[in-house]
């Protein structure tokens, strides 16, 4: 078996490392640099340039020079953030046939994984030149908050580059591996704050000695997949554009050549201000008007830059609070803080993080290289070269299905250790129902519509039977890469259907970030909605039971009693169309009372009618029968047959 290399496929820069004699080593590229810009350019003579060569010619070829492509992976063209990106980048973002966001270069549409594959090829060749042998296997890192679609797309990029991706590993987890491998033995809880070029992650990780084995267990992870160094650059670019406009009256934002020069200058100034208190952005001949050429010359102080980006830094602290809360820890219980990603070199970022955790971050972890080093170590673990290391990562978002009334029923909760498999038994909601729909969701909202649909599929040809009798086993299988497989099986016939969540149905970066924020902001709203749905389900169940009792009673019920029950049914059905919980409860109580005497009468003749009546419907889906049986399409029910 050949070497398994470790690749940090970054938004701004990428890095490759190998395990050499038990130690991880970052490999220099052909230009002698340890990191490679994640930039790809297509020239007029048909050549594809990657890395520094592509970056050097960007000013003269802006429309065919692609950067920050990682931020497009898993996105739909119509997403708000993609529409915003279209206005900010000099190249063309186009809509693919399936609605995804692709790029267009010289009349050809390219998928983000295709473009990312060019960077991976460069990393692959860098490793091959160093090792003197072919490399076919790799561990590739992704932001911890990447969704299923983005992980799939990253694997696709690896395959296009000629690499078998042995494992997708989360960037903060990889950094923890790099940190923990050469440290003294002992249990520690560390926080990895990863602010890269395009994404932000925070992971709380416990490093422990367990029977002589170093165990890295992720306790919680959180993040923002649309926050990174690119956003810091944009803030400074906007400031420079405004300054130039106020001085000259000319707006540079529509000039792609000028904006490309500004982007380079802003990035350079931002980096300089991490060490200096002031720098000068000097761009001669930036544009021209009837009076002649115009030059841009703006002094920028560190204080000015910090005032421009302070809100961005502050935005990174909310996920930190959530991650600590999910891990059940306080900031004072964190033993070490590790900073990862080039943007963490900014003094303001270091100060805010130190203030938040109450301690300075370690300085012995290289923020640009730690992730690739960790990926190489994981490659060594998979290849058997590294012993006594166990990595326990987690899934960042809850996975579940839609249940009765539009509620999301979780199967795998967020921060569950992966790989994992969860099964639950569902049943039919209606008599003689022959099919159920399994609607797979990802997110933190109770209301299904507030989460992202990952896909749906039907299990058909269920033998006709009374409601609640068929048993349909739904299985969620989440692998070590965080990629999901879902299957549904009719236990009586053995008939099975399954779905692998594909990239075209995945979440966008903005959607993931937004759904977590929405969940926190709408917690009370969600609770009220859930209670209303449960009450409606109880009402539906009571209506079903009352009608069935009337039907079975036949001529044994007198006309006045029958009319009273039918009136109560109509009033309850009308009440459930509204949102007034008290009104629904009153009508439910009225029907319960009206049908109580009749049900008691019938109980002696038909012992199981009362239990049947207590069951609740599950839309097209399902109903819980026993401890592990819940409404297939829709709602869980307790053993006492009452809706939760």
Swiss-Prot record:
Keyword flag Transport: no
Compositionally biased region (Low complexity): 604-621
Modified residues annotated as Phosphothreonine in this record: 199
Source organism superkingdom: Bacteria
SUPFAM superfamilies: Actin-like ATPase domain, Heat shock protein 70kD (HSP70), C-terminal subdomain, Heat shock protein 70kD (HSP70), peptide-binding domain
Induction summary: By stress conditions e.g. heat shock.
Entries under InterPro entries matching the protein: ATPase_NBD (IPR043129), Chaperone_DnaK (IPR012725), Heat_shock_70_CS (IPR018181), HSP70_C_sf (IPR029048), HSP70_peptide-bd_sf (IPR029047), Hsp_70_fam (IPR013126)
Region Disordered, annotated ranges: 599-644
Biased composition (Acidic residues): 628-638
Record GO terms (molecular function): ATP binding; ATP-dependent protein folding chaperone; unfolded protein binding
Function summary: Acts as a chaperone.
Family of this protein: Belongs to the heat shock protein 70 family.
Protein name: Chaperone protein DnaK
């Amino acid at each position: 078996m050949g070497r398994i290399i470790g690749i940090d496929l970054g938004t701004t820069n990428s890095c490759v490392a190998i395990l050499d004699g038990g130690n991880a080593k970052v490999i220099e590229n052909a230009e002698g640099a340890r990191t490679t810009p994640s930039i790809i350019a297509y020239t007029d003579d048909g050549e594809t340039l990657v890395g520094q060569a592509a970056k050097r010619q960007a000013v003269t070829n802006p429309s065919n020079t692609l950067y920050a492509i990682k931020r497009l992976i898993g996105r739909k063209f119509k997403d708000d953030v993609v529409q915003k990106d279209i206005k900010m980048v000099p190249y063309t973002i186009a809509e693919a046939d399936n609605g995804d966001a692709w790029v267009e270069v010289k009349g050809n549409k390219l998928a983000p994984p295709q473009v990312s594959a060019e960077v991976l090829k460069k990393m692959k060749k860098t490793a091959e030149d160093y090792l003197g042998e072919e490399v076919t296997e790799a561990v590739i890192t992704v932001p911890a908050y990447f969704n299923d679609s983005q992980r799939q797309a990253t694997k696709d990029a690896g395959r296009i580059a000629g690499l078998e991706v042995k494992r997708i590993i989360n960037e903060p987890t990889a950094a923890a591996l790099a940190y923990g491998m050469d440290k003294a033995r002992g249990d520690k809880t560390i926080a990895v704050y990863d602010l890269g070029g395009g994404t932000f992650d925070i992971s709380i990780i416990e490093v422990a000695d367990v029977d002589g084995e170093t165990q890295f267990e992720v306790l919680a992870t959180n993040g923002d997949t649309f926050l990174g160094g690119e956003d810091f650059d944009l803030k400074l670019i906007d400031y420079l554009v405004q300054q130039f406009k106020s001085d000259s009256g000319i707006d540079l934002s529509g000039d792609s050549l000028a904006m490309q020069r500004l982007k380079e200058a802003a990035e350079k100034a931002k980096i300089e201000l991490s060490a200096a208190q002031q720098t000068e952005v000097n761009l001669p001949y930036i544009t021209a008007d009837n009076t002649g050429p115009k030059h841009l010359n703006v002094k920028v102080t560190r204080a000015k830059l910090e005032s421009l980006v302070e809100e961005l830094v502050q935005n990174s602290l909310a996920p930190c609070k959530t991650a600590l809360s999910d891990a059940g820890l306080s900031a004072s219980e964190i033993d070490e803080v590790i900073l990862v990603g080039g943007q963490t070199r900014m003094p303001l970022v270091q100060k805010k993080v130190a203030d938040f955790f109450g301690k300075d971050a370690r300085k012995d972890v290289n923020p640009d290289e730690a992730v690739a080093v960790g990926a190489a170590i994981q490659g060594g673990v998979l290849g058997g070269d590294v012993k006594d290391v166990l990595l326990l990562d987690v899934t960042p978002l809850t996975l579940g299905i839609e249940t009765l009334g539009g509620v999301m029923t979780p199967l795998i909760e967020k921060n569950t250790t992966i790989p994992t498999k969860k099964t639950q038994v569902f049943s039919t909601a209606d008599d003689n129902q022959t099919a159920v729909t399994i609607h797979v969701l990802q997110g933190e909202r109770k209301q299904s519509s507030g989460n992202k649909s990952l896909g749906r599929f039907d299990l058909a040809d269920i033998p006709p039977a009374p409601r609640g009798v068929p048993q349909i086993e739904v299985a969620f299988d989440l692998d070590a890469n965080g990629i999901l497989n879902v299957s549904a099986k009719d236990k009586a016939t053995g008939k099975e259907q399954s779905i692998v969540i594909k990239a075209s149905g995945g979440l966008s970066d903005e959607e993931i970030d937004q759904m977590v924020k929405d969940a926190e902001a709408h917690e009370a709203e969600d609770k009220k909605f859930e209670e209303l749905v449960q009450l409606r389900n109880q009402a539906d169940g009571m209506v079903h039971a009352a009608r069935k009792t009337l039907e079975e009673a036949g001529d044994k019920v007198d006309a006045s009693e029958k009319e009273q029950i039918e009136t109560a049914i109509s009033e309850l059905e009308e009440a459930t169309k509204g949102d007034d919980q008290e009104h629904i409860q009153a009508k439910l109580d009225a029907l319960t009372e009206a049908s109580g005497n009749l049900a008691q009468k019938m109980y002696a003749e038909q012992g199981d009618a009362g239990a049947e009546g207590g069951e609740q419907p599950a839309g097209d889906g399902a109903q819980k029968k026993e401890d592990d049986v819940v409404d297939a399409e829709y709602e869980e029910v307790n053993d006492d047959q009452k809706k939760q």
